[in-house]
Amino acid sequence: MQIKTYKIKDICDIKRGRVISKLYIKNNPGEFPVYSSATVNNGEIGRIKDCDLKGEYVTWTTDGAQAGSVFYRNGQFNATNVCGILKVNNDEIYPKFLAYALRLKAPKFVNYACPIPKLMQGTLAEIELDFTSKKIQEKIATILDTFTELSAELSAELSAELSAELRERKKQYVFYSDYLLNPKNWK
């Protein structure tokens, strides 16, 4: 099996999104997602009527507490100026595999020495990753997709179970607090 090592700058076009304010989102509602530095809701901060990007991309959070977070995007969307954008320009690279590989490596390159953590274009461009054949990249990405889905399902189920358990414990607490603090029950 042949392994090739590439710097991000050698396999991707690298850019950042544009400034899209909350006011712009409010005044231009539409169907196309706007991704920012947030990681909640998959990074989506709203939807607008226009679309800057179409196709398969990898995005990353450039600034803030979640700097270095990496996402695979496929479809029509927009990205703000605190969202870096990678467009694969090498036929040997599967974008989703790139996203998974970069997700592991990018956080190691975040600059925490600044007041606001950053992972800028120049730094990301120099990150080196190893790649196998595109066919194997696709298989690996499919396996990781399955694990990601199972993990999300399990998290949702556990969250629901824990919430239900917590509600029951709170009911018990109220019941026993009322009982134990009632002077009639102190006999």
Curated annotation (Swiss-Prot):
Superkingdom field: Bacteria
Keyword DNA-binding (UniProt): yes
The entry's keywords: DNA-binding, Restriction system
A GO MF label: DNA binding
SUPFAM superfamilies tied to this protein: DNA methylase specificity domain
Annotated S-S bridges: none
GO terms (BP aspect): DNA restriction-modification system
Family, as annotated: Belongs to the type-I restriction system S methylase family.
Role noted for this protein: The N-terminal section of a specificity (S) subunit of a type I methyltransferase (MTase); this subunit dictates DNA sequence specificity. The single R subunit has multiple frameshifts and is probably not expressed.
Domain comment in the entry: Contains two DNA recognition domains, each specifying recognition of one of the two defined components of the target sequence.
Name the record gives this protein: Putative type I specificity subunit S.MpnORF289P N-terminus
Protein's organism: Mycoplasma pneumoniae (strain ATCC 29342 / M129 / Subtype 1) (Mycoplasmoides pneumoniae)
